[in-house]
Amino acid sequence: MATDADMAIFGEAAPYLRKSEKERIEAQNKPFDAKSSVFVVHAKESYVKSTIQSKESGKVTVKTEGGETLTVKEDQIFSMNPPKYDKIEDMAMMTHLHEPAVLYNLKERYAAWMIYTYSGLFCVTVNPYKWLPVYNPEVVLAYRGKKRQEAPPHIFSISDNAYQFMLTDRENQSILITGESGAGKTVNTKRVIQYFATIAASGDKKKEEQPAGKMQGTLEDQIISANPLLEAFGNAKTVRNDNSSRFGKFIRIHFGATGKLASADIETYLLEKSRVTFQLKAERSYHIFYQIMSNKKPELIEMLLITTNPYDYQYVSQGEITVPSINDQEELMATDSAIDILGFTPDEKTAIYKLTGAVMHYGNLKFKQKQREEQAEPGGTEVADKAAYLMGLNSADLLKALCYPRVKVGNEYVTKGQTVQQVYNSVGALAKSVFEKMFLWMVVRINQQLDTKQPRQYFIGVLDIAGFEIFDFNSLEQLCINFTNEKLQQFFNHHMFVLEQEEYKKEGIEWEFIDFGMDLAACIELIEKPMGIFSILEEECMFPKATDTSFKNKLYDQHLGKSNNFQKPKPGKGKAEAHFSLVHYAGTVDYNITGWLEKNKDPLNETVVGLYQKSSLKTLALLFASVGGAEAESGAGGKKGGKKKGSSFQTVSALFRENLNKLMSNLRSTHPHFVRCLIPNETKTPGAMEHELVLHQLRCNGVLEGIRICRKGFPIRILYADFKQRYKVLNASAIPEGQFIDSKKASEKLLGSIDVDHTQYKFGHTKVFFKAGLLGLLEEMRDEKLAQLITRTQARCRGFLMRVEFKKMMERRESIFCIQYNVRAFMNVKHWPWMKLFFKIKPLLKSAESEKEMANMKEEFEKTKEELAKSEAKRKELEEKMVSLLQEKNDLQLQVQAEADGLADAEERCDQLIKTKIQLEAKIKELTERAEDEEEMNAELTAKKRKLEDECSELKKDIDDLELTLAKVEKEKHATENKVKNLTEEMAALDETIAKLTKEKKALQEAHQQTLDDLQAEEDKVNTLTKAKTKLEQQVDDLEGSLEQEKKLRMDLERAKRKLEGDLKMTQESTMDLENDKQQLDEKLKKKDFEISQIQSKIEDEQALGMQLQKKIKELQARIEELEEEIEAERTSRAKAEKHRADLSRELEEISERLEEAGGATAAQIDMNKKREAEFQKMRRDLEEATLQHEATAAALRKKHADSTADVGEQIDNLQRVKQKLEKEKSELKMEIDDLASNMESVSKAKANLEKMCRSLEDQLSEIKTKEEEQQRTINDISAQKARLQTESGEYSRQVEEKDALISQLSRGKQAFTQQIEELKRHLEEEIKAKKCPAHALQSARHDCDLLREQYEEEQEAKGELQRALSKANSEVAQWRTKYETDAIQRTEELEEAKKKLAQRLQDAEEHVEAVNSKCASLEKTKQRLQNEVEDLMIDVERSNAACAALDKKQKNFDKILSEWKQKYEETQAELEASQKESRSLSTELFKMKNAYEESLDHLETLKRENKNLQQEISDLTEQIAEGGKAIHELEKVKKQIEQEKSELQTALEEAEASLEHEEGKILRVQLELNQVKSDIDRKIAEKDEEIDQLKRNHLRVVDSMQSTLDAEIRSRNEALRLKKKMEGDLNEIEIQLSHANRQAAEAQKNLRNTQGVLKDTQIHLDDALRSQEDLKEQVAMVERRANLLQAEIEELRAALEQTERSRKVAEQELLDASERVQLLHTQNTSLINTKKKLESDISQIQSEMEDTIQEARNAEEKAKKAITDAAMMAEELKKEQDTSAHLERMKKNLDQTVKDLQHRLDEAEQLALKGGKKQIQKLEARVRELEGEVDAEQKRSAEAVKGVRKYERRVKELTYQSEEDRKNVLRLQDLVDKLQMKVKSYKRQAEEAEELSNVNLSKFRKIQHELEEAEERADIAESQVNKLRAKSREIGKKAESEE
């Protein structure tokens, strides 16, 4: 650990990088209890520091730092590390490795602003959200050359380590920077680039001058300036980050051999182009749009025809438009200057701005809908004119292309109409594409500019890419990012543990290698392997009718339940809908696949793309040059056009995978360094850290994954000496004292003597390795031991100190005793006189001497003091001199050492240079000698060639003369001269072939074509020979005529002959000389040709291997196509079988319905039914037999498939062997290339070292210059030869590189094909049942092909032999010619006979050649014909396989849909029955409640009437009293009293009325409460409706929800019954009325029973219908089995059809018949498709019927719920009415009591005051009694009448209600019966149609079978004839060979 002095070089950054010494000491001395200090899981804070209070029964009670007491499980506590590990720089060194330890270490370091921390291989950085002085220039210099452990954690340390590793290990490096948006990835990437630009540029201070006009700024400036430009076009504001990079980038910085910066390049990934057209509210688009509109450069506003207000442009104003932390004006100037520095031309710069402005204008394009049409039309042309002007287009063409694009249909283009939405979508896609392509083009241009063409040796790559993303809504972009991180994490796991395990291996630890990279293999394979997610996505993109649902279904079929990493998402409230889940290493992510197909295809308007390609803006045309537009494709021709078309449909996922694979291959070739960036909080607050957020990122970016892997190994390792020194205290006796012992053995003995798990540690060569956690245990044991030792030591120290103190006390005691004794003695003699005298005299004796001594001592003291001062001054001077001398000495030593090192290096370099120079001189001499030899040979050859040509021309002239003379003599002589002329032509042809060979040396790729040309030349020679033959025949005829003339001239010629003899001798001698010269030249040429042939043989071998591989690839491609066509054919056959099955199912259903209709009618019908059943049983047996046969054939097919797979495996093995051979040759060539490169490199290094030596050592330079001047002449002489040789070696190396590229391309193709083969194997296993006949056909075709190949090879051999015979004949002709020339005059007669023989043999040979050629041509034709037949057969096989696959797929889908609908139907039936039962029970309860309610209303009305009568009586009585008062004047007082009482009664009545009003208010309040309760119930009902709808979508919870609703309804019914009982208890007084109601209820119950009986009958009918439906299902299953049987028959038919097609190819007449049959089958197929459509319509009809039933069930449920609410309301109202009636009853009683009291008072008053008026009173009383009687009688009568009326009304209502219910039930049943009858009729009709179709198919089958048998017979006859012909041809060939 560095001291504070060492940290001083970091300047003001030191406190932000490492703790001070004081803090470290304080941390180590902090009190700490290892057993009680723990981290605890917390709900809010994730983990908190706590102290253990107690433990009991698996529970632990802890107290947190905040004072909170918690009780947790034991697995929820984590041990805390000792204080010395606080703020540790490398978290991998911690004793306890777990999540809370990592979290709190990061938190504490972040709180101290130490933002960089190591975690094993990782460097973790936390965003500080403020500026820290840790990137200053002095920090860069401080980190330079420091090892990782020597300096604090920092991004500069990672960068410098990568740089140093690159220089020392000679290996490429990479730095992987990942993290979420806003974590600081881009900033750290900038710092890395800044660091490299600083340290690599500082190594070479003298900058090289760049050519004028090429670039502005140095390479360092350009690398740094690339960032502002990429950020302007690729960065944007997001919610988390104001400057978020919306793309990933991999920056490669290249360095030379000396570490100097050489060049750079950038690769980008996953640009978020959707941001161009859409942004969220809190975000904004890319910075460049807002920079342009900042008006910092007004000329841009004018040029782009835009305004400065972003809200004028829809694409860039959907979110925010300004960012507080970014100054758009300054950024614009930075972007503009970056464009200039990076060397963009002014035109390119203008084009960038114009295209950016055009994208903004695109967002403002308006379109509208035409009247009465869906077609879109432009809403104006102003914006389009601006956009078209900026893009160099015609606005009218642009609008036309957008509204009416051209689409390719077949081979023609048609114009397609677009809706408004489609046009807007197209415009958005084009805008995104333009921006994306412009961004990628800028990256390419930047790379071109950063490529300085300087020599570069190594590179350091910096990867800045988004981290793992888990959002609420995850789409395709998240899958790509997460897949990238999955691959990077796998790469990290593999790399990390490879390093770990290399350490174990180096230390000699026994360890079984574990590749932790394979932990993530399952998820990676699920995504990228064949039939993975990307594969299925790309496959779906190829199908035009594919949808998101079909994509989801394929994913589920392929992976759900088969792969643990693929799961079905769990629905959560508030979350976005998800379609599937993937288990990544960072967690489970739910993905939504909406729109993935469109995103992946990324379609563009091809017509507009065609306009872009023709744009006058060159940059735009360049951007879309490689995209195949509508016009471009139609106009493209040749191979190039086809290639573009093929590559135009490249999906986004395929491109992404290609880039990712390239990135991973780059990373695997480097040594990686990992940096993980973290966001501390969401609010961008400096210093604050959110625990859950940081933990989530640690999981996502693999830090915790790295800890997991680290824990599986031995993460903690300590040197033996350190371990012995620190832990010796644990058992000191284990290490013997007094003798030497090795630290390793001491550590082994020490650990062996301690009670720990011995499997938790291992001993290496130099270190002891511990598992995680064991060191913490050792630390605890050490602390305990130290505590024991310290307590013992303290005890001994205290005892020793006390003993010392006691000894001192004893000594003090003795001295005190002595002093006391002396004092006592002195006190005794003090007063003695002699003692007094002694005291006076003693001091006087030595006083004078002492004064002298004191004076002398003072003088000496002063002298010594002065001397001491002088000596101190001298000493200081000497010390200063010594320090300065030491410093000078050290400096001089350093200089001497440096000069010595430099001298040693220089000497070594000089020696190396001399050696290399000698080697080079030797090589140059060899090369010059070889070159001179070759030049001399060439010169001699050319001279001799010219000589030969001249002599040949002279000879030709002489021969022509001779021929003219000999033509007159004899015809044979003339023929031989013609042949001589032909031979001379052949010599010229041979010269031409030599010239061709020299050309082939320059262009080796044309070798194959040259061989073809030679072949053609041979054929031409044969043709010329045939022509010569015809000419000779004509000449023979002519010469026979002139024979007589020749005889006459013979005598003349004899004389001429003697004369010419001398000339001939001379010519013969000259020709002999020429031939000798020619032989010498030929030998030299052969030597030269031998060297050329060696090179050519190598190249030809490589070409042959390449051709073989290409053939294999073609064969594999053909095989793939065959298999795909087989799958397609299988699918079609399956579709046909499916249609047959559907037809037969309808037939069976009709039959079953007929049987049911006719069931039980008559005995005859019963017999018919029995017969039908017997037939059915027979058919079932036949079906079972057919299935057995089918299984047998399937087994045979499996066996054949296994054989075919074995053949394919052998082919693959052969290909692998070829590949290994090629790779071996490739490695040899690479080694040669490496040797050449190393030689060139050593030369360049030597040159550079020489230049340096020349600058540093001038003396040596003068001597070397003299030597160089002497050698310069020789170098100048050989420089031209060297340049020529270098060009030749460059050509050879280029050819080798091309071959390497070809080999790598072939190997990639091979890998792709092996993957395709694996996919096809899986397809083959599924589609194996339909391969019997195609496999036979394929085998027979292969057999024929092999036979033909053998014949062809035999014919080729025969042809070669004929050619050899021909050449032999030619050579013999040449020999005869020479003999003729030498002995022509002497032996003319012998020459003539020989010439005749030669002519005859030549003629025979020519005839034989013609015969062989004709035979070859015929064999070639038969081979071509058979190849065509094989190709046709393969196409048919592929079709059948494809049809089978399609059928199988449709079968599965149909079965799945059928089972789902069956399940839904059963569930709805159950729900319907339950709802019907509930509705019946509720309707009965409703009837009861209604009756009770009406009775209570009647009772209330009677009470009201009685109340009114009583009030009337009271008023009558008061009137009578008033009349009595008027009649009797004496009783005025009584009257007053009565009036007073009357007023009191009125007040009482008013009070009663007030109480009545109060009660009415109560009633109103109760009604209001009732309404509120009703609304609550309605709300609850609505909520339950929503729940029911949701639960119906999820079928698993339907039963529970129905049960809950049932329970609720039972509770409400119980509540109603309870209310009813209470009501009956309250209404005991009106039992008479209740009896009437009971009787009516009994009658209603009777009616209810009747209706229930009717409902039971209907239920029975319904059950019968269900049973019949189940019977129909069984019959459908039977029909399916019959369909399978028919499918097997169809397969047999297909086999027969294919057999007939083979025979058709033998006999062309049969071909026509078979094609007619195919047409017939096609018509059948179309009819079956129509039946399939009918079936689909029937299914849709059934679905609609099921939906109706579901709707009825829902209506029934709603009615039931309404009935419940009505019943509850009625019960409440009934209760209220009962309360009011009881209250009125009480009021009535009170009023009766008051009337009685009044009556009593009135009697008393009359007795007191009216003694005389008794008679009148009695009369009045009698009158009153009569009136009362009449009133009572009238009341009784009216009450009875009212009761009767009410009774009859209730009865009428009940009857009407019952009749309405009956009528509804009858109608419902009638509808059900009608529907069932309709179904029965449709099933009958379908069965009849199926029966007819089956009959037709059977007749066709019989007919085709008959024709098949005939065709097979004809095929056998034809095959036997072919075999005979082959045998004949072989016999003829053998005869010809024997004759020769």
From Swiss-Prot:
The gene is MYH1B. PANTHER family: MYOSIN HEAVY CHAIN, NON-MUSCLE, MYOSIN-4. Keywords: Actin-binding, ATP-binding, Calmodulin-binding, Coiled coil, Cytoplasm, Methylation, Motor protein, Muscle protein, Myosin, Nucleotide-binding, Thick filament. ATP binds at G179, E180, S181, G182, A183, G184, K185, T186. Pfam families: Myosin_head, Myosin_N, Myosin_tail_1. This is Myosin-1B. Gene3D superfamilies: 1.10.10.820, 1.20.5.340, 1.20.5.370, 1.20.5.4820, 1.20.58.530, 6.10.250.2420, Kinesin motor domain, Myosin S1 fragment, N-terminal. Residues 1928-1940 have a biased composition (Basic and acidic residues). It comes from Gallus gallus (Chicken). The keyword ATP-binding applies. The modification N6,N6,N6-trimethyllysine is found at K130. Belongs to the TRAFAC class myosin-kinesin ATPase superfamily. Myosin family. Muscle myosin is a hexameric protein that consists of 2 heavy chain subunits (MHC), 2 alkali light chain subunits (MLC) and 2 regulatory light chain subunits (MLC-2). Residues 1912-1940 are annotated as: Disordered. Residues 86-783 form the Myosin motor domain. One of its GO terms (molecular function) is microfilament motor activity. Muscle contraction.
